[in-house]
Amino acid sequence: DVVRFLNERYGMHMDAASTAADKRRIYLEMLEKEGMQPIREVVEFVHSLGDAPKAIATGSAMPGASRTLAAAGLSGLFDVILTPDEVEHGKPAPDMFLKAAELLGASPDRCVVFEDAEPGMKAAAAAGMDCVQVRRPSLS
């Protein structure tokens, strides 16, 4: 959607697939070189949930999602990891959250979404799920 917007708005001619691949590659290179600083409170909270069913519904492709979770010390703590490749419509459509609930065997009205971006908050509302906004310190 971003590539289409830029192409239309500024008369650019970027290919969406190759631009997305470049973005993923650059992100993984940066993660490898610079690491990441997870939000400590989020990491502590996820650990505090213990065996409660948990899912990640991320806009990232699986390689980036897996590496990010590992860098944050969260590998193996989620029962389900969903990426946009696994649903017909990504956020802000509710598809990812509804599929996550289904895979967890949970009713959407019993799920809570923790989200840091507006499209995800809209997706949670459309899925009929409660949503808690997570503010990223670097963007607050």
What residue spans do the PLM features occupy?
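Helix-loop "lid/cap" segments that line or gate small-molecule binding pockets
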Residues: 1-14, 68, 100-101
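Metal-dependent phosphoesterase signature
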Residues: 7-44
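Hydrophobic alpha-helical core bundles mediating ligand binding, dimerization, or RNAP-core interactions
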Residues: 2-3, 20-27, 64-69
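Short, acidic loop-to-helix structural element flanking the phosphoryl-transfer center
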Residues: 29-56, 62, 66
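Asp-based, Mg2+/Mn2+-dependent phosphohydrolase catalytic module
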Residues: 43-44, 48, 61-140
